[in-house]
Amino acid sequence: MTDEFYHKDIFGAIIDINLGEAEDDESLPLDKKGREFNIFALTDAVGARDKKRAWMLYQGALAAGISAEEVFFKIVWQVKCLLIASKTANVGETDMKPFPYSKAKSFLKNFKSGELEKLSEDLVVGYHLARRGEGEIETLVEKILLSL
């Protein structure tokens, strides 16, 4: 028996030959140094309100092949966690896991009252403008990060 594996169409014709090569599993994107890029370092920088580190990590994410839209939704997730943490007294009142909740609670000291709501509004409005063709997600993410 050979290592060849044939894929046939409904007429019996061979359409693909796999010579025993393992298919690549989906792996995390790599940064310039060949390490796996950690997107949560970027969300931590957003929570810490460190605009320089957040922007640098954003550029690293783009260089690692992560789409701007994926980064955008991670930022939305972080802002949502911060808003939930700001409106609750403990993790029991939420559907969140204890670790992200405690991180969000610790990041709340970096934001004044109303700033999270404004940031959330800017993200939502900017996303819809970009979807209508009135801007780009890449530019929106960059503006949001630099306005922290």
Feature annotation, model-predicted:
Residues 1-148:
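Conserved beta/loop motifs at nucleotide-recognition and modification sites
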